[in-house]
Structures are given as structure tokens and as C-alpha cells.
């Protein structure tokens, strides 16, 4: 995988550098409640600022549908960016036109300016050539540090790279290098853990993974659908019975590709979906008709951890059970801790991503121990599905 990075950027003092960042952070009562995404892009902004560039930040926030919406203004985010960077961040009330141009013209070398929400213009999501040209007029160089938006062919993620010299920021670079280790050119054996509630949201993912990994562990509500497809009565467990044929096709594809499928052999069942509910461990073939499986059981955990022990590379998307409710977090926590320990010892490359996955690893207090944890959501999932990422592909073409 070849693309230009900040290492290739020299002599940029005084240059206007347009940096696409991900500032789509949660806000409550006007306050940013989670600054993770801002922290991720801070190193790129600081590096460009220290090199004397005029740093101009481009980002979207929410879904304003091509029109200005007051509570989706990036002005709300500017103070949080300032706090993390520990330097003044100026704000312009538009991302194109005179307001943007004048604010950029007023910048001194090394200063940072945040432009207004790119999605306040319909041309952003349409990747409209006229809008791209208007954005490009504000910069000499383009840096994309928003992998999380790389699956969208929008003006600020893909269009700009066709108009200006384009580079990957440090977060984009780290993400792409980690993903290359995960599935692009991994050390084998490769084990994938895929969990979560529904097979229907991850059909493309499963079909792609069985061709690329040595073993696929299926957990969460998804496992019930696969068990039911094999004739197992899963009681009142979450199950997509209408996807039985899809599940069978995925199992057949795995068999043909030589990919081992690891399904639960036992489970933790309960009759109520609440914290501290009465529960018991049963064989998956003995799930009571009035109960639901909410986590995989101890024998299944042992089997999963055995696969993690054999793996050189682990790719993880989705929890193994209803981890947000005690005691149905045991399997997810046990597998996460085992993977983290092997990663710390240098025996495993572990790459994880997806909102629930990040929350689960944080719950297990091991997120920092994984080789890489992606906060990219949709882009991470589409990468795992083997789909093209326009924002990445255009950077490779620039090389």
C-alpha cells in the first residue's frame, strides 16, 4: 500500500494546508462529551503547525442535508479543539467564498483555522465539481486525516485530492498501516471474531472474511441464527430465522475456503434481559424454550481463547454477548483480556473496530493494549467487507 504521508511534506512554511479531519463528536448541552476523535487528529495538526503551515481544518458535523443548521455548526466544537491543541483556533462562518478566503488570508504561519461544516453545502455530499473547485481555491496542499469518512466519495474526502497535492495525515497513515497488518498482508494464522446482534447487517463482511481468514468466530445474537440454520432450537433468543439459507451459504463458502467456523457449544441463558437476571449455563442443544442465550458459555470461551492462542493476527468486530449487562459480559471480557495479553507479549497483532467493539474493549479495560483500535465505524466495516474506500484509493493514485 503506497501513499504520500507527512514525511513527504517539506518546506511548507506559509503554505495553506487544507486538512480533512473527523470532528463528528458527541455533544450534549453545547459541550463535547467525548474528545477521542479530536485527540486522534491533534498530532497531524500540531506537526503541520510546527512546520509553519497555515492549517485550515475541514470537517462535517451531523447531517444538515446541504443547508445551514445552527446546532450543527462547528463553532460549537472549536473550543474543544483549542483545548486539546493548547493553541488558539480561529473560526470562519463558511468553508468557501469570501468569508473563508478572508479568514485564511489573515492567518499567520503556524496558526490554525476551522472552517464551517462542509455539509452546509449540497455540493459536499454530491462531490460537485464546482464546490470542489471552491474548496480547492482555499489551499495549496491537501491532507486527509479522516479515515472514518474515507468510504464516502465526497468533495472534502475524495474530490479535493484530484485538485491539490494529496497526503495522508498521521491518523490516516496509522489506520491504513494497521489494516494492512490485519487483512491486507497479515501474519498467519488469522482469526476473526465477529459478533453483534444481527447477521443481516454483516452478510458482506462474513462473505469476505471466510475467504481471507483461517478461522471465523461467530458470537452475539448472530450465532443464534447460524445455530438455528443447523437445526438447533434457540428458544426465545434473538434470531433471524429468515436468514437460515444465507447462514448455510456462508458456512458452505467457509468450508470450501478452508476457513474454520467457531460457533458456541454452550451458552448463558436467562428468561429476562436485565442486569443480574437469574441465569444458567446450558449446552446450545438444550436451550429452554422460554429462555434466551445472552452470552456464550465457559466451554465456548475456552475454544475461542484456544484460537486466539494459535493466531498471529486477530481482527475483531462486535461483542460475543450482551456485554453491557452484567453478567453477560464474561465471554467478551475473557477473550479481550486474552487477546490483550498476547498482544502485550508481542505474540499477536490485534486490530479491532466498530462502535460496540470499542465500547466492549473499553469495558474490559484493554483497548490500549490492542495493536490498533479503529474509531472509524462505517469505514472500518467497509474495509473489512473488502469494499473500495474512495478517500483512500485517491491517495494511492496520487503516489
From Swiss-Prot:
* Family matches, as SUPFAM superfamilies: Phosphoglycerate kinase (SSF53748)
Catalytic function, reaction form: (2R)-3-phosphoglycerate + ATP = (2R)-3-phospho-glyceroyl phosphate + ADP
Q: Where in the cell is it found?
A: Cytoplasm
Transferase recorded as keyword:
yes
- Which UniProt keywords are given for this protein, alphabetically ordered? ATP-binding, Cytoplasm, Glycolysis, Kinase, Nucleotide-binding, Transferase
Task: Give the matching PROSITE patterns.
Answer: PGLYCERATE_KINASE
Chief localisation class: cytoplasm
What GO MF annotations does this protein's record show?
ADP binding; ATP binding; phosphoglycerate kinase activity
Q: Which residues bind substrate?
A: 22-24, 37, 60-63, 119, 152
Biological process annotations from GO: gluconeogenesis; glycolytic process
Quote the EC number. Answer: 2.7.2.3
A Pfam family matched in the record: PGK
What is one GO cellular-component annotation here?
cytosol
Give residues annotated as binding ATP.
202, 324, 354-357
Instruction: Identify the metabolic or biological route this protein is part of.
Output: Carbohydrate degradation; glycolysis; pyruvate from D-glyceraldehyde 3-phosphate: step 2/5
Q: Belongs to which family?
A: Belongs to the phosphoglycerate kinase family.
Subunit info here reads: Monomer.
Cross-referenced HAMAP family, in alphabetical order?
Answer: Phosphoglyc_kinase
Name of the featured protein: Phosphoglycerate kinase
Write down the species.
Sinorhizobium medicae (strain WSM419) (Ensifer medicae)
